[in-house]
């Protein structure tokens, strides 16, 4: 079955097929709820499902517009006249669209996802540098002592401020690494793309460590201050 609806990547018959949402039949340009991968065509990833280019530095508004357009066009109410099977298929496609949208909402999510598509995991392959491990040990000591030592609490506050500053710097580093990876995709360059994944892994891995430290330090500091014991 086919149903037409508005989508920013499908407004024109000249729109590249790869930039049409996957639920659009590549031959007719119309929504096809029975769509299956064509011969030699891979299963769609999040980018393909939303009809967006496989890039990390995507415009947030473009992601939202693609999601809203697809969810509106795939709303089950539009397919009631075609029977329960069509409604069920629309619901299934809507679920995939929602999953894709949730998986691509932030720059960090998109960076992690392109690593996943390449069969990589930032957490598994990341090896923290000695300087970061030293900070982890220092933070662990301060966290352990913050509940009963006012001086350790002051130290932990300083460490937390430092971790937050590091996190901001890592966000900028990730944007640079993402730009390098995106540049390797047009035209597609497998070697350059593989090389560009290394900085993504490093930044994401370090960000996870710093996020963990921020969370633990914040939790420790939310406990009562030993300098002002409860009566």
Kindly give the residue locations of the regions a language model identified:
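C-terminal accessory/regulatory regions appended to core domains
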Residues: 1-231
